[in-house]
Protein backbone atom coordinates (compact mmCIF):
# COMPACT_ATOMS: atom_id res chain seq x y z
CA UNK A 1 0.00 0.00 0.00
CA UNK A 2 1.47 3.33 -1.04
CA UNK A 3 0.58 5.76 1.72
CA UNK A 4 1.92 8.76 3.53
CA UNK A 5 3.07 7.97 7.06
CA UNK A 6 3.73 11.15 9.00
CA UNK A 7 5.44 10.90 12.35
CA UNK A 8 5.31 13.91 14.66
CA UNK A 9 8.50 14.27 16.69
CA UNK A 10 8.04 16.57 19.71
CA UNK A 11 11.20 18.31 20.85
CA UNK A 12 11.03 16.65 24.28
CA UNK A 13 10.95 13.12 22.80
CA UNK A 14 13.81 13.29 20.31
CA UNK A 15 16.09 10.93 22.21
CA UNK A 16 13.25 8.50 23.04
CA UNK A 17 12.07 8.33 19.44
CA UNK A 18 15.55 7.62 18.15
CA UNK A 19 15.41 4.21 19.87
CA UNK A 20 12.69 2.59 17.75
CA UNK A 21 11.88 4.98 14.90
CA UNK A 22 11.43 3.03 11.65
CA UNK A 23 12.47 5.26 8.77
CA UNK A 24 11.63 2.44 6.39
CA UNK A 25 7.94 3.01 7.15
CA UNK A 26 7.88 6.79 7.56
CA UNK A 27 7.46 9.01 4.54
CA UNK A 28 7.54 12.25 6.52
CA UNK A 29 8.95 13.31 9.89
CA UNK A 30 7.69 16.55 11.44
CA UNK A 31 9.91 18.14 14.08
CA UNK A 32 7.59 19.85 16.57
CA UNK A 33 8.52 22.60 16.74
CA UNK A 34 9.17 26.32 16.64
CA UNK A 35 6.62 28.84 17.90
CA UNK A 36 5.26 31.75 15.88
CA UNK A 37 4.68 34.97 17.79
CA UNK A 38 1.69 37.25 17.45
CA UNK A 39 3.61 39.81 15.38
CA UNK A 40 5.09 37.69 12.61
CA UNK A 41 8.32 36.58 14.29
CA UNK A 42 9.65 33.19 15.26
CA UNK A 43 10.02 33.01 19.04
CA UNK A 44 13.73 32.55 19.79
CA UNK A 45 13.75 33.33 23.53
CA UNK A 46 11.52 32.84 26.55
CA UNK A 47 10.49 35.76 28.80
CA UNK A 48 13.27 34.58 31.13
CA UNK A 49 15.78 34.97 28.32
CA UNK A 50 16.33 31.22 28.03
CA UNK A 51 16.37 29.51 24.65
CA UNK A 52 13.03 27.75 23.95
CA UNK A 53 13.03 23.97 24.19
CA UNK A 54 12.26 23.62 20.50
CA UNK A 55 15.35 25.54 19.47
CA UNK A 56 17.51 23.60 21.92
CA UNK A 57 16.30 20.29 20.49
CA UNK A 58 16.71 21.60 16.95
CA UNK A 59 20.41 22.11 17.64
CA UNK A 60 20.88 18.90 19.62
CA UNK A 61 23.22 16.18 18.41
CA UNK A 62 20.40 13.65 18.70
CA UNK A 63 18.10 15.53 16.33
CA UNK A 64 20.83 16.51 13.88
CA UNK A 65 21.82 12.85 13.59
CA UNK A 66 18.23 11.64 13.36
CA UNK A 67 17.38 14.21 10.69
CA UNK A 68 20.42 13.27 8.61
CA UNK A 69 19.64 9.55 8.84
CA UNK A 70 15.97 10.04 7.99
CA UNK A 71 16.74 12.16 4.94
CA UNK A 72 19.38 9.64 3.82
CA UNK A 73 16.67 6.96 4.06
CA UNK A 74 14.35 8.99 1.83
CA UNK A 75 12.14 10.45 4.56
CA UNK A 76 10.94 14.01 4.08
CA UNK A 77 11.83 15.96 7.26
CA UNK A 78 9.67 19.03 7.82
CA UNK A 79 9.57 21.74 10.47
CA UNK A 80 6.40 22.34 12.47
CA UNK A 81 5.57 25.98 13.12
CA UNK A 82 3.11 26.16 15.98
CA UNK A 83 0.77 28.81 17.27
CA UNK A 84 -1.44 27.71 20.17
CA UNK A 85 -4.30 29.79 21.50
CA UNK A 86 -5.76 27.50 24.13
CA UNK A 87 -4.64 29.55 27.13
CA UNK A 88 -6.06 32.87 28.23
CA UNK A 89 -4.68 35.74 26.19
CA UNK A 90 -2.91 33.60 23.61
CA UNK A 91 -5.81 33.50 21.17
CA UNK A 92 -5.78 37.28 20.95
CA UNK A 93 -2.18 37.13 19.74
CA UNK A 94 -3.24 34.63 17.09
CA UNK A 95 -5.94 37.09 16.02
CA UNK A 96 -3.40 39.89 15.83
CA UNK A 97 -1.07 37.83 13.65
CA UNK A 98 -3.69 36.55 11.23
CA UNK A 99 -5.38 39.94 11.03
CA UNK A 100 -2.23 41.70 9.85
CA UNK A 101 -1.23 41.20 6.22
CA UNK A 102 2.21 42.62 6.96
CA UNK A 103 2.84 40.23 9.87
CA UNK A 104 1.54 37.24 7.92
CA UNK A 105 3.95 37.92 5.08
CA UNK A 106 6.82 38.54 7.48
CA UNK A 107 6.16 35.22 9.18
CA UNK A 108 5.96 33.39 5.86
CA UNK A 109 9.30 34.82 4.76
CA UNK A 110 10.96 33.94 8.08
CA UNK A 111 9.63 30.39 7.88
CA UNK A 112 10.97 29.93 4.36
CA UNK A 113 14.35 31.35 5.37
CA UNK A 114 14.63 29.01 8.38
CA UNK A 115 13.65 25.99 6.30
CA UNK A 116 16.30 26.86 3.74
CA UNK A 117 19.01 27.52 6.33
CA UNK A 118 18.35 24.32 8.29
CA UNK A 119 17.89 22.03 5.31
CA UNK A 120 14.30 20.99 5.97
CA UNK A 121 12.13 19.49 3.23
CA UNK A 122 9.06 21.51 4.04
CA UNK A 123 6.78 22.94 6.70
CA UNK A 124 3.93 21.74 8.86
CA UNK A 125 1.68 24.48 10.28
CA UNK A 126 -0.02 23.75 13.60
CA UNK A 127 -2.34 26.63 14.48
CA UNK A 128 -4.98 25.72 17.03
CA UNK A 129 -7.70 26.43 17.82
CA UNK A 130 -9.00 28.38 14.85
CA UNK A 131 -11.92 30.76 15.47
CA UNK A 132 -14.45 30.57 12.65
CA UNK A 133 -14.13 34.29 11.94
CA UNK A 134 -10.41 33.80 11.18
CA UNK A 135 -10.86 30.99 8.64
CA UNK A 136 -10.21 33.24 5.63
CA UNK A 137 -7.19 34.92 7.23
CA UNK A 138 -5.63 31.55 8.01
CA UNK A 139 -6.06 30.45 4.41
CA UNK A 140 -4.26 33.64 3.39
CA UNK A 141 -1.37 32.82 5.72
CA UNK A 142 -1.08 29.31 4.28
CA UNK A 143 -1.03 30.74 0.76
CA UNK A 144 1.67 33.21 1.76
CA UNK A 145 3.77 30.43 3.27
CA UNK A 146 3.28 28.41 0.08
CA UNK A 147 4.46 31.33 -2.05
CA UNK A 148 7.48 31.94 0.19
CA UNK A 149 8.47 28.27 0.06
CA UNK A 150 8.06 28.19 -3.72
CA UNK A 151 10.45 31.12 -3.98
CA UNK A 152 13.06 28.92 -2.29
CA UNK A 153 12.19 25.57 -3.88
CA UNK A 154 8.91 24.51 -5.46
CA UNK A 155 9.48 20.95 -4.18
CA UNK A 156 9.20 21.97 -0.53
CA UNK A 157 6.21 20.32 1.13
CA UNK A 158 3.49 22.14 3.08
CA UNK A 159 0.89 20.61 5.39
CA UNK A 160 -1.56 22.02 7.92
CA UNK A 161 -2.85 20.42 11.12
CA UNK A 162 -6.58 20.49 11.79
CA UNK A 163 -8.27 19.72 15.12
CA UNK A 164 -10.85 16.95 15.03
CA UNK A 165 -13.86 19.25 15.31
CA UNK A 166 -12.78 20.88 11.99
CA UNK A 167 -14.26 24.11 13.37
CA UNK A 168 -12.66 27.22 11.90
CA UNK A 169 -10.66 25.38 9.24
CA UNK A 170 -11.63 25.93 5.60
CA UNK A 171 -10.39 22.57 4.34
CA UNK A 172 -11.05 23.37 0.70
CA UNK A 173 -9.19 26.66 0.89
CA UNK A 174 -6.35 25.26 2.97
CA UNK A 175 -5.68 22.47 0.45
CA UNK A 176 -6.22 24.44 -2.76
CA UNK A 177 -3.53 24.31 -5.45
CA UNK A 178 -1.90 27.49 -4.15
CA UNK A 179 -2.01 26.40 -0.49
CA UNK A 180 -1.11 23.23 1.44
CA UNK A 181 -0.37 19.83 -0.05
CA UNK A 182 -2.09 17.98 2.79
CA UNK A 183 -4.41 18.58 5.73
CA UNK A 184 -3.56 16.48 8.79
CA UNK A 185 -6.70 15.72 10.79
CA UNK A 186 -5.81 15.19 14.43
CA UNK A 187 -7.98 12.15 15.10
CA UNK A 188 -7.77 12.29 18.89
CA UNK A 189 -8.82 14.22 21.98
CA UNK A 190 -12.48 13.62 21.18
CA UNK A 191 -12.48 12.95 24.91
CA UNK A 192 -10.26 15.10 27.11
CA UNK A 193 -9.36 15.17 30.81
CA UNK A 194 -12.73 16.69 31.65
CA UNK A 195 -14.87 14.06 29.90
CA UNK A 196 -18.03 13.01 31.74
CA UNK A 197 -17.80 9.38 30.61
CA UNK A 198 -14.58 7.39 30.24
CA UNK A 199 -13.69 6.03 26.83
CA UNK A 200 -11.26 6.27 23.96
CA UNK A 201 -9.63 9.60 23.20
CA UNK A 202 -9.85 8.52 19.55
CA UNK A 203 -13.07 6.50 19.17
CA UNK A 204 -13.55 5.01 15.74
CA UNK A 205 -17.32 4.74 16.05
CA UNK A 206 -19.08 6.01 19.16
CA UNK A 207 -22.81 6.84 19.28
CA UNK A 208 -22.35 9.07 22.33
CA UNK A 209 -19.81 11.59 21.01
CA UNK A 210 -18.17 12.80 17.82
CA UNK A 211 -15.82 10.16 16.46
CA UNK A 212 -13.35 9.42 13.68
CA UNK A 213 -15.99 8.09 11.29
CA UNK A 214 -18.14 11.22 11.61
CA UNK A 215 -15.12 13.51 11.30
CA UNK A 216 -13.97 11.85 8.09
CA UNK A 217 -17.53 11.88 6.73
CA UNK A 218 -17.55 15.65 7.15
CA UNK A 219 -14.04 16.19 5.81
CA UNK A 220 -14.54 14.00 2.74
CA UNK A 221 -17.61 15.99 1.81
CA UNK A 222 -15.33 19.03 1.50
CA UNK A 223 -12.07 17.84 -0.06
CA UNK A 224 -10.75 14.82 -1.99
CA UNK A 225 -9.50 11.92 0.13
CA UNK A 226 -5.99 12.21 -1.28
CA UNK A 227 -5.66 15.60 0.40
CA UNK A 228 -6.21 14.17 3.89
CA UNK A 229 -4.09 12.34 6.46
CA UNK A 230 -5.57 10.94 9.67
CA UNK A 231 -3.23 11.37 12.65
CA UNK A 232 -3.68 8.77 15.39
CA UNK A 233 -2.58 8.78 19.04
CA UNK A 234 0.29 6.86 20.54
CA UNK A 235 -0.99 8.01 23.93
CA UNK A 236 -4.02 7.16 26.02
CA UNK A 237 -6.44 8.68 28.49
CA UNK A 238 -7.09 7.91 32.16
CA UNK A 239 -9.87 8.89 34.55
CA UNK A 240 -11.20 8.04 37.97
CA UNK A 241 -14.56 6.33 37.40
CA UNK A 242 -17.59 5.22 39.38
CA UNK A 243 -17.32 1.57 38.29
CA UNK A 244 -14.92 -0.84 36.63
CA UNK A 245 -17.34 -1.34 33.73
CA UNK A 246 -17.49 0.51 30.43
CA UNK A 247 -19.11 2.89 29.95
CA UNK A 248 -18.70 4.50 33.34
CA UNK A 249 -19.13 8.06 34.53
CA UNK A 250 -15.93 9.81 35.53
CA UNK A 251 -15.35 11.29 38.97
CA UNK A 252 -13.60 14.45 40.07
CA UNK A 253 -12.85 16.19 43.31
CA UNK A 254 -10.11 17.40 45.62
CA UNK A 255 -9.28 13.89 46.89
CA UNK A 256 -9.81 12.07 43.59
CA UNK A 257 -7.17 11.65 40.90
CA UNK A 258 -8.08 13.70 37.84
CA UNK A 259 -7.86 12.95 34.15
CA UNK A 260 -4.48 12.21 32.60
CA UNK A 261 -2.87 11.36 29.26
CA UNK A 262 -0.44 8.47 29.73
CA UNK A 263 1.90 7.52 26.92
CA UNK A 264 1.33 4.27 25.06
CA UNK A 265 4.20 2.68 26.98
CA UNK A 266 2.72 3.76 30.33
CA UNK A 267 -0.74 2.46 29.41
CA UNK A 268 0.69 -0.90 28.33
CA UNK A 269 2.65 -1.16 31.58
CA UNK A 270 -0.59 -0.68 33.51
CA UNK A 271 -2.51 -3.23 31.42
CA UNK A 272 0.30 -5.72 32.06
CA UNK A 273 -0.65 -5.50 35.73
CA UNK A 274 -4.43 -5.35 35.53
CA UNK A 275 -5.37 -6.99 32.23
CA UNK A 276 -6.44 -5.69 28.84
CA UNK A 277 -10.03 -5.37 27.62
CA UNK A 278 -11.17 -4.20 24.20
CA UNK A 279 -14.02 -2.08 22.87
CA UNK A 280 -14.52 -3.08 19.23
CA UNK A 281 -16.81 -0.16 18.32
CA UNK A 282 -14.41 2.47 19.63
CA UNK A 283 -11.46 0.30 18.47
CA UNK A 284 -9.65 0.87 21.73
CA UNK A 285 -8.06 -1.24 24.46
CA UNK A 286 -8.65 -0.39 28.11
CA UNK A 287 -7.96 -1.55 31.63
CA UNK A 288 -9.50 -0.83 35.03
CA UNK A 289 -8.28 -1.16 38.60
CA UNK A 290 -9.31 0.03 42.10
CA UNK A 291 -7.76 3.32 43.09
CA UNK A 292 -7.51 5.54 46.14
CA UNK A 293 -5.50 8.78 46.18
CA UNK A 294 -4.74 8.47 49.90
CA UNK A 295 -5.65 6.28 52.87
CA UNK A 296 -8.63 8.46 53.82
CA UNK A 297 -9.62 9.47 50.28
CA UNK A 298 -12.70 8.10 48.50
CA UNK A 299 -12.31 4.70 46.82
CA UNK A 300 -12.80 4.86 43.06
CA UNK A 301 -11.92 2.89 39.98
CA UNK A 302 -9.31 4.03 37.51
CA UNK A 303 -9.80 3.39 33.79
CA UNK A 304 -7.02 3.74 31.22
CA UNK A 305 -7.89 3.72 27.51
CA UNK A 306 -5.34 3.42 24.72
CA UNK A 307 -4.86 2.13 21.17
CA UNK A 308 -3.01 -1.18 21.08
CA UNK A 309 -2.16 -3.11 17.87
CA UNK A 310 -5.82 -4.07 17.37
CA UNK A 311 -7.18 -0.54 17.87
CA UNK A 312 -4.41 1.26 16.01
CA UNK A 313 -4.60 -1.27 13.19
CA UNK A 314 -8.37 -0.89 12.84
CA UNK A 315 -8.05 2.88 12.51
CA UNK A 316 -5.23 2.61 9.97
CA UNK A 317 -7.42 0.21 7.99
CA UNK A 318 -10.33 2.64 8.15
CA UNK A 319 -8.26 5.59 6.95
CA UNK A 320 -6.70 3.70 4.06
CA UNK A 321 -9.98 2.00 3.23
CA UNK A 322 -11.57 5.41 2.68
CA UNK A 323 -8.80 6.42 0.30
CA UNK A 324 -6.98 8.90 2.51
CA UNK A 325 -3.44 9.85 1.57
CA UNK A 326 -2.21 8.14 4.71
CA UNK A 327 -1.93 8.25 8.47
CA UNK A 328 -0.01 10.22 11.06
CA UNK A 329 1.33 9.45 14.53
CA UNK A 330 1.23 11.68 17.59
CA UNK A 331 3.79 11.19 18.81
CA UNK A 332 6.99 9.32 18.08
CA UNK A 333 8.75 8.32 21.30
CA UNK A 334 5.56 7.65 23.26
CA UNK A 335 5.87 3.97 22.42
CA UNK A 336 8.77 3.88 24.89
CA UNK A 337 10.93 1.51 22.88
CA UNK A 338 8.10 -0.97 22.25
CA UNK A 339 7.80 -2.13 18.65
CA UNK A 340 4.32 -3.61 18.24
CA UNK A 341 2.72 -0.44 16.86
CA UNK A 342 5.46 -0.28 14.23
CA UNK A 343 4.85 -3.95 13.44
CA UNK A 344 1.13 -3.19 13.11
CA UNK A 345 1.82 -0.39 10.68
CA UNK A 346 4.09 -2.59 8.61
CA UNK A 347 1.51 -5.37 8.51
CA UNK A 348 -1.15 -2.92 7.29
CA UNK A 349 1.01 -1.24 4.66
CA UNK A 350 2.92 -4.30 3.47
CA UNK A 351 0.73 -7.28 4.29
CA UNK A 352 2.14 -10.77 3.94
CA UNK A 353 0.45 -14.08 4.55
CA UNK A 354 1.22 -15.12 8.12
CA UNK A 355 -0.27 -18.39 9.32
CA UNK A 356 2.46 -19.30 11.81
CA UNK A 357 1.84 -18.48 15.48
CA UNK A 358 4.51 -16.99 17.72
CA UNK A 359 6.30 -19.03 20.36
CA UNK A 360 7.89 -18.47 23.72
CA UNK A 361 8.64 -19.62 27.22
CA UNK A 362 7.23 -18.77 30.63
CA UNK A 363 8.37 -19.08 34.23
CA UNK A 364 7.49 -17.84 37.70
CA UNK A 365 9.59 -14.95 38.97
CA UNK A 366 11.94 -16.55 41.53
CA UNK A 367 11.42 -13.64 43.94
CA UNK A 368 7.71 -14.47 44.20
CA UNK A 369 8.16 -18.21 44.87
CA UNK A 370 7.48 -19.18 48.50
CA UNK A 371 8.87 -22.69 48.20
CA UNK A 372 8.21 -26.04 46.54
CA UNK A 373 5.37 -28.52 47.17
CA UNK A 374 4.88 -31.74 45.22
CA UNK A 375 7.04 -30.38 42.41
CA UNK A 376 5.04 -27.16 42.11
CA UNK A 377 6.22 -23.60 42.80
CA UNK A 378 4.37 -22.23 45.82
CA UNK A 379 2.93 -18.74 45.29
CA UNK A 380 0.41 -16.54 47.09
CA UNK A 381 -2.42 -14.61 45.46
CA UNK A 382 -0.70 -13.41 42.30
CA UNK A 383 1.62 -15.31 40.00
CA UNK A 384 4.42 -13.02 38.85
CA UNK A 385 5.24 -14.33 35.39
CA UNK A 386 8.37 -13.85 33.35
CA UNK A 387 7.59 -14.27 29.67
CA UNK A 388 9.90 -14.53 26.70
CA UNK A 389 8.14 -14.67 23.34
CA UNK A 390 8.90 -13.88 19.73
CA UNK A 391 7.36 -14.22 16.31
CA UNK A 392 8.99 -15.87 13.32
CA UNK A 393 11.46 -13.71 11.34
CA UNK A 394 8.89 -13.17 8.58
CA UNK A 395 5.94 -12.96 10.97
CA UNK A 396 3.64 -10.04 11.67
CA UNK A 397 4.95 -9.47 15.22
CA UNK A 398 3.71 -10.06 18.75
CA UNK A 399 0.47 -8.40 19.81
CA UNK A 400 -1.11 -10.00 22.88
CA UNK A 401 -0.69 -12.50 25.71
CA UNK A 402 -3.55 -14.55 27.14
CA UNK A 403 -3.40 -16.39 30.46
CA UNK A 404 -5.95 -18.68 32.06
CA UNK A 405 -6.38 -21.56 34.49
CA UNK A 406 -8.17 -23.83 32.05
CA UNK A 407 -6.73 -25.20 28.82
CA UNK A 408 -9.99 -25.27 26.84
CA UNK A 409 -9.61 -23.54 23.48
CA UNK A 410 -12.03 -21.68 21.21
CA UNK A 411 -12.20 -22.33 17.47
CA UNK A 412 -9.67 -19.58 16.79
CA UNK A 413 -7.18 -21.21 19.15
CA UNK A 414 -7.39 -18.83 22.09
CA UNK A 415 -8.11 -19.86 25.65
CA UNK A 416 -11.85 -19.70 26.27
CA UNK A 417 -11.42 -18.69 29.90
CA UNK A 418 -8.64 -16.29 30.72
CA UNK A 419 -7.40 -12.75 30.83
CA UNK A 420 -5.76 -10.91 27.94
CA UNK A 421 -2.68 -8.74 28.42
CA UNK A 422 -0.26 -6.81 26.21
CA UNK A 423 2.70 -8.82 24.93
CA UNK A 424 4.89 -7.97 27.92
CA UNK A 425 7.85 -9.67 29.56
CA UNK A 426 6.38 -9.41 33.06
CA UNK A 427 2.73 -9.97 33.93
CA UNK A 428 0.95 -10.21 37.28
CA UNK A 429 -1.76 -12.89 37.08
CA UNK A 430 -4.33 -13.26 39.92
CA UNK A 431 -5.13 -16.83 40.99
CA UNK A 432 -8.45 -16.18 42.75
CA UNK A 433 -10.29 -14.47 39.88
CA UNK A 434 -13.25 -16.69 38.95
CA UNK A 435 -13.51 -15.04 35.53
CA UNK A 436 -10.16 -16.57 34.61
CA UNK A 437 -11.00 -19.98 36.08
CA UNK A 438 -9.57 -19.14 39.50
CA UNK A 439 -10.86 -19.81 42.99
CA UNK A 440 -10.35 -18.36 46.48
CA UNK A 441 -9.48 -21.86 47.70
CA UNK A 442 -5.87 -22.88 48.23
CA UNK A 443 -4.57 -25.69 46.08
CA UNK A 444 -2.83 -26.57 42.82
CA UNK A 445 -3.21 -24.43 39.72
CA UNK A 446 -2.29 -25.02 36.10
CA UNK A 447 -1.45 -21.67 34.49
CA UNK A 448 -1.90 -21.70 30.71
CA UNK A 449 0.01 -19.04 28.74
CA UNK A 450 -0.25 -18.25 25.04
CA UNK A 451 0.58 -15.44 22.62
CA UNK A 452 -1.11 -13.92 19.59
CA UNK A 453 0.55 -12.18 16.68
CA UNK A 454 -0.73 -9.15 14.79
CA UNK A 455 -2.11 -11.40 12.04
CA UNK A 456 -4.32 -13.13 14.62
CA UNK A 457 -2.53 -16.46 15.11
CA UNK A 458 -2.67 -17.88 18.65
CA UNK A 459 0.15 -20.11 19.91
CA UNK A 460 -0.58 -23.42 21.66
CA UNK A 461 -0.66 -22.77 25.42
CA UNK A 462 2.30 -23.48 27.66
CA UNK A 463 1.51 -24.81 31.13
CA UNK A 464 3.05 -23.83 34.48
CA UNK A 465 2.15 -25.88 37.56
CA UNK A 466 1.93 -23.91 40.82
CA UNK A 467 0.53 -24.32 44.32
CA UNK A 468 -1.57 -21.38 45.56
CA UNK A 469 -1.35 -21.08 49.35
CA UNK A 470 -3.38 -17.89 49.83
CA UNK A 471 -5.18 -16.97 46.58
CA UNK A 472 -7.19 -14.17 48.18
CA UNK A 473 -4.04 -12.29 49.14
CA UNK A 474 -3.50 -10.18 46.08
CA UNK A 475 -2.98 -6.58 45.16
CA UNK A 476 -3.87 -4.80 41.94
CA UNK A 477 -1.39 -1.95 41.65
CA UNK A 478 -1.79 1.10 39.51
CA UNK A 479 -0.60 4.69 39.39
CA UNK A 480 -1.90 6.31 36.20
Model-derived segments and spans:
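Short, acidic/polar
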Residues: 9-23, 99-116, 165-174, 307-320
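Glycan-binding loop/region signatures in secreted carbohydrate-active enzymes
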Residues: 92, 234-315, 347-350
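Active-site groove signature of glycoside hydrolases
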Residues: 108-137, 185-189
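Glycan-recognition patch characteristic of GH18 chitinases/ENGases
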Residues: 1-111
